[in-house]
């Protein structure tokens, strides 16, 4: 299958996806917010006042959900890509495995973290068969 046909199929699938459409209505940056919402409904993770770190945060829908549900808590969103701010959260652009980024996290978290979350995907472009 040609790449152009694959791209068209992906676009058509996105247009039909109920979660993609609902994310636009609800103001989430991506459909993945509903995955976290489902997890939270089952396990009751997010409460007011929590300190939350979102690793691999871009485009930010998990951070949006955490900020909305953890309300008065602290949110740090970390990603290699620059991200638009979410409320009064802290955005750190960097690799969380690097010491410089870890120091920035420590500087902003005040020693205590209640939730560490990540929805990162493996970069398959680096895998060669």
Regions found by a protein language model. Give the residues of each.
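Conserved SAM-binding loop of SAM-dependent methyltransferases across substrates and taxa
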Residues: 59-70
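Conserved class I S-adenosyl-L-methionine
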Residues: 48-58
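Conserved small/polar residues in nucleotide/adenosyl-binding loops
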Residues: 127-129
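Short SAM/SAH-binding signature in class I
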Residues: 113-123
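Local beta-strand N-terminus motif with an aromatic residue
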Residues: 49, 112-113
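S-adenosyl-L-methionine
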Residues: 81-112
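Class I SAM-dependent methyltransferase Rossmann-like catalytic core
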Residues: 1-47
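Conserved SAM-binding motif I beta-strand of class I
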Residues: 74-79
